[in-house]
């Protein structure tokens, strides 16, 4: 009898906690199915900490989550059985390719199968919590100190760049690109972006007009970018999103759907200059190209 009373007492408290979320958040939670528990775990983590800005940040991520998804693939044998393989389990991409070749020898007619999965169905609480905490670690760096909190939420806080497979990237990128804090200290935004571009060209190959990706993978994941060290303009644009956001620099992807002089689209990035005016920049070319918005 006492146990029943305790359960009845806890249930209204739980329902009350659910109702404290903004309407937009509740709408996404209603679509999340079994993964709702992960989203509420992340929300409640920050609610319990009581930091009003971090609460707004996690609410922003969840409220806008239902439109986002990942495009990925897996390997399947001739019987339709999924064959386990994770290229990030190997120290280098060359090792991963060798392992894949071994799998192909062991499994007849190994073929890639494309699939998509929604963020609201798959994202984990720990991933969201880490993303928010690390984004706030760089929020007050010199590049971000002039922007509004809404701009921070739109262009630094987000955990993905496009439709790439989700991978826990912030800690790795914060460490890999932390050198920019010394190298570009006191420099203009344009000069800072040139530092990033110079670094990228030392280790990342632009594969445009050189090779086409054989797997049905529209975008490399954040950690795949660091391991494969090559990709076309859309991957380079995503790489810049991860690298700049990891250091507290506002950035987003931009694109031209069709060139007047050629077929196909082209991807690049946008940010704000020191006067807080939007500028486009493209690091995929031999020198960084800057253009202002009309």
List where the protein language model places each region.
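Bacterial Sec-dependent N-terminal signal peptides
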Residues: 1-21
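Secondary-structure boundary elements
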Residues: 38-41, 49-228
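Residue-level marker of intrinsically disordered, low-complexity segments enriched
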Residues: 4-8, 59-60, 111, 277
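Hydrophobic/aromatic-rich core segments of domains that either
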Residues: 21-33, 47-48, 182-199, 213-223, ...
